UniProtKB/Swiss-Prot annotation:
Lineage, opening ranks: Bacteria, Pseudomonadati, Pseudomonadota, Gammaproteobacteria, Pasteurellales
HAMAP family: UPF0102
Pfam family, one: UPF0102
NCBIfam families reported for this sequence: PRK12497.1-3, YraN family protein
Gene Ontology terms for molecular function: nucleic acid binding
Family stated for the protein in its record: Belongs to the UPF0102 family.
Provenance organism: Haemophilus influenzae (strain PittEE)
Protein known as: UPF0102 protein CGSHiEE_03775
InterPro entries reported for this sequence: Restrct_endonuc-II-like (IPR011335), tRNA_endonuc-like_dom_sf (IPR011856), UPF0102_YraN-like (IPR003509)
Signal peptide: none
Source superkingdom: Bacteria
Length: 119
């Protein structure tokens, strides 16, 4: 059985997917796990593969959801994306892709979308 934290995470990831689909993106995959990290959502925006990190913070005592994506997390995100692309016979060097962040506050309605977060 999932812990409450995992259930909440799954709920916010689902809300992020619905939000992005409402903006015209199409779903490719979710929760792709690699030794180096996980890709929360993989979406398609026309000809662009979009690797989406979903973050949620109900309290700002430890920083905001955006601030929680530190350098180390960014490196894991890039590494996982490169491994996923390799399975598709692509790489970060030749694929048309970007890295978007979906940041939630306390509720699914408190959402912020930052395209090209790693630009």
């Amino acid at each position: 059985m999932f812990s409450l934290k995992r259930q909440q995470g799954a709920s916010f990831e689902h809300q992020a997917r619905l939000f992005l689909e409402s903006k015209g993106l199409t779903f490719i995959a979710a929760n792709q796990n690699f030794k180096c990290g996980e890709l929360d959502l993989i979406m398609n925006d026309k000809e662009t593969i979009v690797f989406v990190e979903v973050r949620q913070r109900s309290h700002s005592a430890y920083g905001s959801a955006i601030e929680s994506v530190d350098w180390r997390k960014q490196q894991k995100w890039l590494d996982a994306a490169n491994l996923w692309l390799a399975k598709q016979n692509m790489s970060l060097e030749d694929a048309n892709c970007r890295f978007d962040l979906i940041a939630f506050g306390k509720t699914p309605q408190d959402i912020q979308w930052i395209p090209n977060f790693l630009d």
